[in-house]
């Protein structure tokens, strides 16, 4: 027996996919979300749950975990018409008798339209590249931070020079016993305001240095030797916790097999977010067009447009003029 055919299937359960699902529910659509990870929320939930986000409209500051919780709470209003499938990777899809058949790593799904909101795809941390690094990865060497409190009273060394590295250093300043930030360049790549805060903090910065060796025992790293760039100078740092903040590599490997026009790891879209195949739309970092700004807020603005276009595609003879949410929710 064939599974139920949904109006819209959203590939990706990150912030943009969740808001698209909410808006589709608001418009009365049945929706299925297919997410490759074991939880909803995407990178903010999985990689940066305690990192503070400052560029979400109407929220001066909130963490990745808080953003995810609010989006899921918003979505729960339409639990009766929204299905969620976790730990499923979309392998391919094809159009059969006017509807889409979506093949995942676990099952087949059926949908009248598709919105791709999978961001830049699967992600994995960039490592130090040291031989014995993975010996400590399950204990006190971290590539992302799930709880700031686990570093309370500890000597923390952070490697990296971007926004995440600087943000973690500032967040741990005063909570950890000491914070040392190691970067391979003299200049940090973080936002100017954050760099100014760093200069006025108690964080020790060591630049330009690169990691050279790790020492430890019983799976716990307790020393890291760093070397100054273009120099023989070496420093050995004693530590309790090591955070590697070199960012994450991403891959949308299956995207190339979807028979859609793409550029690098994103799908080329029209001004109305339709891909090269009618009935399939892309939003968020999964969409590529000139002038796009890679912000969550950008994707939030794209979602209603894509949903409305999907509804027009599914029900071309219906009066599809969108109305304000105040008229739809009591």
Swiss-Prot record:
Matching InterPro entries: FAD/NAD-bd_sf, FAD/NAD-binding_dom, Fd--NADP_Rdtase_type_2, Ferredoxin-NADP_redctase_2
Required cofactor names: FAD
Reactions it catalyzes: 2 reduced [2Fe-2S]-[ferredoxin] + NADP(+) + H(+) = 2 oxidized [2Fe-2S]-[ferredoxin] + NADPH
KW NADP (keyword) present: yes
Binding of FAD, residues: 35, 43, 48, 90, 123, 285, 326
GO molecular function list: ferredoxin-NADP+ reductase activity; flavin adenine dinucleotide binding; NADP binding
Record's cofactor remark: Binds 1 FAD per subunit.
Transcription regulation recorded as keyword: no
Primary enzyme class: oxidoreductase
UniProt entry keywords in alphabetical sequence: FAD, Flavoprotein, NADP, Oxidoreductase
Record-listed E.C. numbers: 1.18.1.2
Similarity section: Belongs to the ferredoxin--NADP reductase type 2 family.
Summary of subunit composition and partner proteins: Homodimer.
Protein name (Swiss-Prot/TrEMBL): Ferredoxin--NADP reductase
């Amino acid at each position: 027996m064939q599974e139920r055919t949904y109006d819209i299937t959203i590939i990706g359960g990150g912030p943009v996919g969740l808001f698209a699902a909410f808006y589709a529910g608001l418009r009365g659509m049945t929706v299925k979300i297919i997410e490759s990870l074991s939880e909803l929320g995407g990178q903010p939930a999985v990689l940066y749950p305690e990192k503070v986000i400052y560029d979400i409209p109407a929220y001066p500051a909130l963490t990745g975990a808080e953003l995810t919780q609010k989006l899921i709470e918003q979505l729960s209003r339409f639990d009766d018409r929204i299905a969620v499938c976790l730990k499923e990777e979309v392998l391919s899809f094809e159009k059969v008798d006017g509807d889409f058949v979506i093949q995942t790593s676990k099952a087949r799904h059926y949908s009248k339209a598709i919105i791709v909101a999978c961001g830049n795809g699967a992600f994995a941390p960039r490592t130090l590249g040291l031989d014995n690094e993975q010996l400590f990865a399950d204990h006190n060497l971290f590539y992302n931070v799930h709880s700031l409190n686990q570093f309370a009273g500890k000597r923390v060394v952070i490697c990296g020079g971007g926004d995440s590295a600087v943000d973690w250093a500032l967040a741990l300043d005063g909570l950890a016993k000491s914070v040392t930030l190691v970067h391979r360049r003299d200049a940090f790549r973080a936002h100017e305001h954050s760099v100014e805060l760093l200069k006025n903090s108690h964080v020790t910065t060591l630049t330009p240095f690169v990691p050279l060796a790790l020492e430890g025992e019983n799976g716990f790293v307790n020393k890291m030797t760093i070397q100054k760039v273009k120099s023989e100078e070496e420093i050995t740092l004693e530590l309790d916790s090591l955070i590697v903040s070199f960012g994450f590599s991403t891959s949308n490997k299956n995207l190339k097999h979807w028979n859609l026009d793409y550029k690098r790891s994103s799908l080329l879209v029209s001004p109305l977010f339709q891909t090269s195949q009618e009935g399939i739309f892309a939003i968020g970092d999964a969409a590529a067009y000139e002038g796009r700004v890679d912000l969550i807020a950008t994707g939030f603005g794209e979602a209603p447009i894509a949903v409305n276009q999907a509804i027009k595609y599914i029900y071309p003879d219906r009066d599809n003029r969108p109305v304000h949410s105040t008229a739809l929710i009591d």
